[in-house]
């Protein structure tokens, strides 16, 4: 395809197409299907927390009238405000009139093309915002990109945060003991009426932690043994082998001791230009190596009540007191046929009902 050259309008050059530069959207946590959708009809919601008193029974004389009794359940209530997001986009005649479609020599752009790009931009912004909020919920807090704290799940549920130090800079570190500590904590603190059994423990870690873990002298051989296609199939039951069949290689995933370690490099930029690294711990340097552990209960489907995301109704008359949806997008024509406005609304709040199962991991030694 020929078009005018940059050097002179009297010369021609080939136009080969359009190259779009789009920031990464990541989405690992969203793709897990970890958070169960829980639509509500209001913009705030309450949650009752019931503590059961379950203890062993003492034997009594069958001829006596003595019997065991249980203490009544203790019930308390906590509240959560919903987070509201609104995005506005517009199409004006100036975006269409005389505008060449990128990647073409002389084709004019169309309203349909511009509309599709606007809607894709809205959806992408929503998706990365939701991924950011999901990751914050896995850290035990409900916080937006500005740093506004809506809820500290540890304080709300009256539990303490657990941190496990792997001491990966020490060649003699007992990594098996650290993993066992993690697994036992999950089992002891689940409080679901049963143990965490069959649910895979996920640990999303940053690049530094993953590198230190897989290069540790006690771990290196186990990691290398998993990098062959046959080993991967035996471990996961998947026929995907990596680069040979066009599927992303699993070089950043490592199973060990019943735990799945995944290197997650997700990061997003907010409107102020600040970059938010998803796998991070406040006040901990990025040279330390950190991660966040949680039980992957996605396979439970609707039975999963550990990770949920509440969606509230759109602030429009026709949607008052109706069950909320993930995202509402409305299209309005401007007065005097001067363009089109798009409005996107979302009330949402991801949360964890058992934040004691959210564990931070660090590559350094405790007190280091």
Swiss-Prot record:
GO terms for cellular component: host cell cytoplasm; viral capsid. Homomultimer. Assembles to form an icosahedral capsid. The assembly is primed by the interaction between capsid assembly protease and portal dodecamer, and major capsid proteins assemble cooperatively to form the procapsid with the help of capsid scaffolding protein. Major capsid protein forms hexons and pentons of the icosahedron. Viral genomic DNA is packaged into the procapsid through the portal vertex. The packaging triggers a dramatic reconfiguration of the capsid shell. The keyword Glycoprotein does not apply. Belongs to the lambda phage major capsid protein family. It comes from Salmonella phage Felix O1 (isolate Felix O1-VT1). It comes from the Viruses. Keywords: Capsid protein, Host cytoplasm, Late protein, Virion. InterPro entries: Major_capsid_GpE. Pfam families: Phage_cap_E. This is Major capsid protein. It is found in: Virion; Host cytoplasm. The lineage of its organism: Viruses, Duplodnaviria, Heunggongvirae, Uroviricota, Caudoviricetes.
